[in-house]
């Protein structure tokens, strides 16, 4: 029998059942294979956030249960792209996006390559009122599950002055995603 480095076929339904507790807040996601050149991650809802991911490579989204959406950011402008159950989206490199999963028990399969040495991801927080970048941090991303929480904590722990918008002076609400989204809704309508 051939030695398959990543094992024999995986029963995805059984894997989902076995990891159901990891696909809910506060964890919300789980990487399937740890030592592959591909990061194959299942992300569960509910999960709302106010950061935007700048991925240097393509990112594939397959929304296989429930609905979600991506909030895109470019040059201070926002756009919403809905991901309905059954939808797939291949996102081009450097498309700043903020996945929003408001539905409980929603599930999305996210597939992306591990980054080549020296190629970093970035995460930025921008002002909901005017779209100006408030903070941006680069990271060498090896594991979505392990590498992101410290980055978020760094932003959340930053002072109000460090979260003050250089464009309009509004203070980013940090962990209060709902306040950020309410402000965005007021300024987008």
Curated annotation (Swiss-Prot):
Pathway: Cofactor biosynthesis; NAD(+) biosynthesis; quinolinate from L-kynurenine: step 3/3. Coiled coil: none annotated. Substrate binds at residues 59, 101, 112. It catalyses: 3-hydroxyanthranilate + O2 = (2Z,4Z)-2-amino-3-carboxymuconate 6-semialdehyde. InterPro entries: 3hydroanth_dOase (IPR010329), RmlC-like_jellyroll (IPR014710), RmlC_Cupin_sf (IPR011051). Keywords: Dioxygenase, Iron, Metal-binding, Oxidoreductase, Pyridine nucleotide biosynthesis. Its EC number is 1.13.11.6. O2 binds at residue 49. Binds 2 Fe(2+) ions per subunit. Its cofactor is Fe(2+). Catalyzes the oxidative ring opening of 3-hydroxyanthranilate to 2-amino-3-carboxymuconate semialdehyde, which spontaneously cyclizes to quinolinate. Belongs to the 3-HAO family. This is 3-hydroxyanthranilate 3,4-dioxygenase. The gene is nbaC.
């Amino acid at each position: 029998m051939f030695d398959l480095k990543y094992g024999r076929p995986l029963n995805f339904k059984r894997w989902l059942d076995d990891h159901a507790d990891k696909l809910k807040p506060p964890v919300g996601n789980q990487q399937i294979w740890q030592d592959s050149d591909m990061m194959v991650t299942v992300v569960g809802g509910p999960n709302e956030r106010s950061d935007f991911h700048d991925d240097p490579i393509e990112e594939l989204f397959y929304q296989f249960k429930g609905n979600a959406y991506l909030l895109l950011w470019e040059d201070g402008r926002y756009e919403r792209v809905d991901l309905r159950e059954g939808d797939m989206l291949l996102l081009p490199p450097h498309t700043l996006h903020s996945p929003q999963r408001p539905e409980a028990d929603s599930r999305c399969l996210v597939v992306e390559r591990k980054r080549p040495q020296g190629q970093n991801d970035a995460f930025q927080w921008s002002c909901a009122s005017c779209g100006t970048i408030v903070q941006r941090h680069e990271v060498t991303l090896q594991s979505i599950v392990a590498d992101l929480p410290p980055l978020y904590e760094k932003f959340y722990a930053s002072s109000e002055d460090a979260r003050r918008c250089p464009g309009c002076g509004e203070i980013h609400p940090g962990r209060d995603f709902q306040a950020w989204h309410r402000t965005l809704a007021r300024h987008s309508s």
